[in-house]
Amino acid sequence: MKIAIFGGSFDPPHKGHIAIVKRALEELDIDYVIIVPTYLNPFKTSFQASPSLRLRWLRKIFLPYNRVKICDYEVRKGRPTYAIETVEFLRRKYAPKKLYYIIGSDNLPTLHKWHKYQKLSHLVQFVVATRKGYKVPKKYKMIEVHEDISSTELRIHPKKRYLPPIVAEEIIRFYRS
């Protein structure tokens, strides 16, 4: 089995995340994309939508995708979880022949600061989803995504056109309340 892990806060999930998953399924030689919402990103101090709410939104959004799995491993831990922990858990669970780890190009400048980065880089092949304004070194596999949407901006100004229709109204109500 070959899998790609796509971790993130998904606070909120948006059409850019869907575009990344679709491109990964089209361009990578994989059986599944496993989406792993964080409980709390180790580089952040808080979240706005609760982990369980973000998990529920992701399950609704990706229900029609038979090659996408939503993994609640980090949410169940109830604490910030390092990528290396999640990778080791998923390696034990699936024993994949190939393991990709999808990151946004905005994560590249701090990737070397990730916990046990050297070990992690030997266990996975990083795939970088491009975003405007970030250069991607040739050593990384790349997925081009043209939807330049920011979860940070959507928390401040939720806009329906950037949100998955199945959860758009719920997300807008949540962030406007």
Swiss-Prot record:
User: InterPro entries annotated for this entry?
Assistant: Cyt_trans-like, NadD/NMNAT, Rossmann-like_a/b/a_fold
Instruction: Determine the domain of life of the protein's source.
Output: Bacteria
Q: Which GO terms describe its molecular function?
A: ATP binding; nicotinate-nucleotide adenylyltransferase activity
Q: Which Pfam families match?
A: CTP_transf_like (PF01467)
Biological processes, Gene Ontology terms:
NAD biosynthetic process
Keywords (alphabetical) are: ATP-binding, NAD, Nucleotide-binding, Nucleotidyltransferase, Pyridine nucleotide biosynthesis, Transferase
Task: Supply the EC number(s).
Answer: 2.7.7.18
Q: In which pathway does it act?
A: Cofactor biosynthesis; NAD(+) biosynthesis; deamido-NAD(+) from nicotinate D-ribonucleotide: step 1/1
Q: Which catalysed reactions does the entry list for this protein? A: nicotinate beta-D-ribonucleotide + ATP + H(+) = deamido-NAD(+) + diphosphate
Q: Member of which family?
A: Belongs to the NadD family.
Q: What does this protein do?
A: Catalyzes the reversible adenylation of nicotinate mononucleotide (NaMN) to nicotinic acid adenine dinucleotide (NaAD).
Q: Which NCBIfam families match?
A: cyt_tran_rel (TIGR00125), nicotinate (nicotinamide) nucleotide adenylyltransferase (TIGR00482)
Q: Which HAMAP family does the entry link to?
A: NaMN_adenylyltr
What protein name is recorded for this chain?
Answer: Probable nicotinate-nucleotide adenylyltransferase
Q: Tell me the organism.
A: Nitratiruptor sp. (strain SB155-2)
